[in-house]
């Protein structure tokens, strides 16, 4: 068996990123929009006759630990972890607030004015009450760790997946699109490969195989879609989506497809460290979210004999560059969202 953890080559990749960062983003085509969003997300087109839009809750989910696993039957599996360091909560709130301003400007450029008439409506107050216990710190052992920040420190609201409820009544009563956004931002792109080799047997060495296990990565900001493991109610708080309800019980749910993502070309990493297994620095790292990260690795991750290759990458971010890269990816997301609204309303 051959296990390979590919090191991150900072100089080469940063050069590529800088070359790409000057390329201007283009409006997504109709085909690209269809590839990005799940089908049948609109009913009675809430945006079609309205010149006003309300945003009840704009939420950004920032991942700072990412886990990815690939398995090949009868060969083995690869588990790769990425850790993000150097980004503070104050910066994440700052990004969320700035994103709200950019989204509002994008909607206004599309012919919509922003309304805050929802704030005193009984259905909005009901939504706030129903969502007051939503966790802002997420720990999923097969996915990673994240924190959720709401723009302008507004209440964190999630619309139900069903059609009926306070969210529907709110849009219907106000007769305008009233929505909430949830956007997941990852910091790493992981690649994994498993190649089945040949089996052999010798008297001296016994049985052996030439299977090969590889993992690699690049530090890149990604707005990512719903993960493949989420269905039904689990779709809430996972992936990227914008849900609006409007007059005549209409709705517009722009939900990114499984595994779809938008990336930024702006580099943000100051340094990357690669290791097989869990690095010593991580054993001492205390997370504000879940305490000792060692406990997470004990849930089916590192040094328990379950993976043929177990690797970690620790990324130290430049805070300002991280902010620029995230906002760049979010600007691209806004282009997709507005294109979806135009084509489906």
Where are these regions (language model features)?
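A structural "domain/chain start" motif
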Residues: 25-138, 153-261, 265-345
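Bacterial Sec-dependent N-terminal signal peptides
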Residues: 1-30
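Surface-exposed intrinsically disordered loops and tails
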Residues: 141-145
């Amino acid at each position: 068996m051959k296990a390979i953890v590919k090191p991150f080559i900072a100089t080469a990749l940063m050069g590529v990123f800088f070359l790409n960062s000057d390329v201007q983003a283009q409006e997504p085509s109709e085909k690209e929009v269809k590839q990005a969003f799940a089908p049948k997300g609109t009913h009675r087109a809430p945006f079609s006759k309205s010149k006003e839009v309300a945003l009840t809750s704009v939420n950004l989910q920032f991942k700072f630990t990412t886990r990815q696993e690939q398995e090949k039957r009868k060969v083995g599996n690869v588990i790769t972890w990425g850790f993000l360091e150097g980004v503070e909560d104050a910066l994440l709130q700052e990004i969320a607030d700035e994103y709200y301003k950019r989204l509002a400007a994008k909607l206004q450029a599309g012919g919509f004015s922003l309304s805050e008439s929802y704030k005193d409506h009984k259905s909005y107050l009901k939504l706030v009450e129903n969502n007051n216990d939503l966790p802002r710190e997420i720990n999923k052992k097969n996915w990673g760790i994240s924190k959720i920040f709401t723009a302008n420190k507004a209440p964190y609201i999630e619309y139900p997946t069903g059609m009926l409820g306070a969210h529907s009544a709110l849009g219907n009563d106000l007769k305008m699109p009233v929505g909430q956004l949830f956007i997941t931002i990852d910091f790493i792109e992981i690649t994994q490969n498993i190649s089945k080799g040949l089996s052999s047997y010798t008297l001296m060495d016994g049985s052996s195989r030439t299977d090969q296990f590889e993992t690699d990565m690049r530090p890149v900001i990604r707005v990512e879609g719903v993960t493949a493991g989420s269905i039904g109610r689990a779709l809430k708080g996972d992936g990227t989506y914008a849900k609006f309800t409007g007059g005549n019980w209409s709705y517009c749910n722009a939900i990114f497809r499984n595994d779809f993502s938008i990336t930024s070309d702006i580099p943000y990493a100051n340094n990357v460290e690669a290791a097989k297994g869990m690095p010593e620095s991580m054993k001492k790292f205390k997370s504000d979210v879940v305490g000792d990260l060692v406990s997470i690795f004990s849930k089916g991750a590192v040094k328990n004999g379950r993976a043929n290759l177990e690797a970690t990458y620790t990324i130290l971010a430049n805070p300002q560059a991280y902010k620029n890269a995230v906002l760049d990816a979010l600007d691209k997301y806004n282009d997709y969202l507005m294109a979806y609204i135009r084509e489906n309303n």
